[in-house]
């Protein structure tokens, strides 16, 4: 089978691009042709996307589009239009936590393209409810993660070494983490916080930390996705505080590496994490509650360790082998 994966692709950044890279690797390992067509580029470069995709797509059986809201919907516009015209099998995976706002704002646009695919895939029950609301067809297949037991580190003692691997963009609400960490430092002055990544707020966040006088904070700058596990291995607790989200792979990576995950209770996250079972949840933008969860984790080591073990077991459902048959059925591959 020859498959073309279409998205706003950038190598080494994780997110949607990371998912596409994993899919390409797994499909190639099973002797299928799997290539990536990126719709990312300047405005003028994107004007030629339809023509370029028509030339490329003729050599493929399936177009698998990965899209989200805003400009992230461009792969759907280009991929569905070309795929339908060329009578290709068109599969679309919708990512991102901003789907509800985008669908409500652009119902005709969304309906036009998402009713012209062969199959729509959503990652969790969170997006499934939005698709139901707009009477759009879908099937649920979660994000996938490459599991490797060598990446898991058993921690005998949970230390107050915190990490966040989310991009420094407004929707990820890193200021909430800085405020919570400042409160944690008053109780646990040996605490450390590593903020991995960059983004439009990177400079402002560094300035905020300086203005607040927060100590023991490390800003790494941009890190290639292949290096993420090195930073996770040096930490014990992952913090995530977005105001909107869907099914973040960063949380799965942390569970896979043996960290305790503390996340805001938004979007699709509660479909992944059950509070007190395989992670801890707090109300969005509530840095006081986040700080309490951070302190609780250090003060309740035995329970926290049990949560980590349960999370590590739960993450196995997101491996390629668990969802491969669903993808093969959708692609029309007979294994």
Describe the predicted segments one by one.
Residues 206-223:
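Nucleotide-activated donor-binding/catalytic signature segment of Leloir-type glycosyltransferases, i.e.
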Residues 289, 296, 303-317, 329:
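A short, well-ordered alpha-helix in the C-terminal region of glycosyltransferases
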Residues 222-223, 230-235:
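Short alpha-helical donor nucleotide-sugar binding micro-motif in glycosyltransferases
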Residues 275-276, 280-287, 296-302:
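Conserved acidic donor-binding segment of nucleotide-sugar-dependent glycosyltransferases
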Residues 4-5, 153-185, 193-198:
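Conserved donor-binding/catalytic core segment of Leloir-type glycosyltransferases
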Residues 243:
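Aromatic "clamp/platform" in nucleotide-sugar-dependent glycosyltransferases that forms part
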Residues 260-263:
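Short hydrophobic beta-strand element within catalytic cores of glycosyltransferases
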Residues 115-151, 220:
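Donor nucleotide-sugar binding/catalytic pocket of nucleotide-sugar-dependent glycosyltransferases
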């Amino acid at each position: 089978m020859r498959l073309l994966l279409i998205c706003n692709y950038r190598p080494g950044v994780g997110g949607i691009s990371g998912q596409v890279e994993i899919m390409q690797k797994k499909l190639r390992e099973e002797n299928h042709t799997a290539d990536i067509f990126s719709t990312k580029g300047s405005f003028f470069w994107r004007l030629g996307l339809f023509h370029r995709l028509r030339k490329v797509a003729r050599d493929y059986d399936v177009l698998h589009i990965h899209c989200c809201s805003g400009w992230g919907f461009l792969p759907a516009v280009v991929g569905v239009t070309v795929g339908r015209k060329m009578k290709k099998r068109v599969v679309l995976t919708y990512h991102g936590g901003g789907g509800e706002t985008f669908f409500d704002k652009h119902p005709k646009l969304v309906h036009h393209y998402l009713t012209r695919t062969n199959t729509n895939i959503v990652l969790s029950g969170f997006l499934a409810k939005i698709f139901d609301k707009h009477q759009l067809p879908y099937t649920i297949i979660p994000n996938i993660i490459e599991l490797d037991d060598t990446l898991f580190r058993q921690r005998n003692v949970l230390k107050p070494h915190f990490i966040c691997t989310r991009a420094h963009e407004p929707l990820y609400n890193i200021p909430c983490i800085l405020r919570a960490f400042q409160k944690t430092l008053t109780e646990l002055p040996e605490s450390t916080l590593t903020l991995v990544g960059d983004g439009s707020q990177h400079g402002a966040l560094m300035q905020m930390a300086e203005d607040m006088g927060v100590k023991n904070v490390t800003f790494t700058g941009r890190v290639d996705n292949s290096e993420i596990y090195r930073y996770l291995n040096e930490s014990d607790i992952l913090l995530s505080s977005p105001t909107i989200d869907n099914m973040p792979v960063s949380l799965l990576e942390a569970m896979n590496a043996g960290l305790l995950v503390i996340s805001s209770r938004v979007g699709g996250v509660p479909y992944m994490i059950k509070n007190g079972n395989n992670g801890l949840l707090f109300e969005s933008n509530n840095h006081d509650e986040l700080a309490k969860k951070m302190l609780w984790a250090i003060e309740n080591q035995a329970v926290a360790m049990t949560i980590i073990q349960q999370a590590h077991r739960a993450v196995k459902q997101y491996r390629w082998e668990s969802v491969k048959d669903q993808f093969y059925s959708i692609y029309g591959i007979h294994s």
